[in-house]
């Protein structure tokens, strides 16, 4: 099985909260697609609660689009990581990490403005696979956690696992 990009970086050295440009590729028509690692938690030390990350998934997708789309950028998807330490965001365009960090902080401020669980988009049996597994208060705790800390940039070059380590891990 090929080594995926997300596993070629040293998770023991990742900072959080932090933005990392995980991958950039071009479509056959020449459009740039960029994937960002939006790391909310320090891997293997912190984790977002399942109800909070689920609610954040519903809110974050819209709020990030409000703050990042435009000027050559259009978000394709924002999805939570299975490890519950962050989200992956795929988009058309190549915004720099600071632009993404600024949009992320603005989106977290928007999460704090949501006053009632009924304001969570698509929170119903028809549009959500586990519509009862939500917590606005947990999502807002996550947002506060981001806003209370400085959003940094994680560098692929600094986090790259050396070839020797990959061989040691039998990859």
Swiss-Prot record:
General function of this protein: Involved in the synthesis of autoinducer 2 (AI-2) which is secreted by bacteria and is used to communicate both the cell density and the metabolic potential of the environment. The regulation of gene expression in response to changes in cell density is called quorum sensing. Catalyzes the transformation of S-ribosylhomocysteine (RHC) to homocysteine (HC) and 4,5-dihydroxy-2,3-pentadione (DPD).
Complex formation: Homodimer.
Cysteine pairings via disulfide bonds: none
Catalysed reaction, written as an equation: S-(5-deoxy-D-ribos-5-yl)-L-homocysteine = (S)-4,5-dihydroxypentane-2,3-dione + L-homocysteine
Enzyme class: lyase
Keywords carried by this UniProt record: Autoinducer synthesis, Iron, Lyase, Metal-binding, Quorum sensing
Highest rank taxon of the organism: Bacteria
Gene3D superfamilies xrefs: S-ribosylhomocysteinase (LuxS)
Molecular functions per Gene Ontology: iron ion binding; S-ribosylhomocysteine lyase activity
Cofactor: binding comment: Binds 1 Fe cation per subunit.
Named cofactor requirement(s): Fe cation
Pfam family, one: LuxS
NCBIfam families: PRK02260.1-2
Protein's name according to its UniProt entry: S-ribosylhomocysteine lyase
Source organism per UniProt: Salmonella typhi
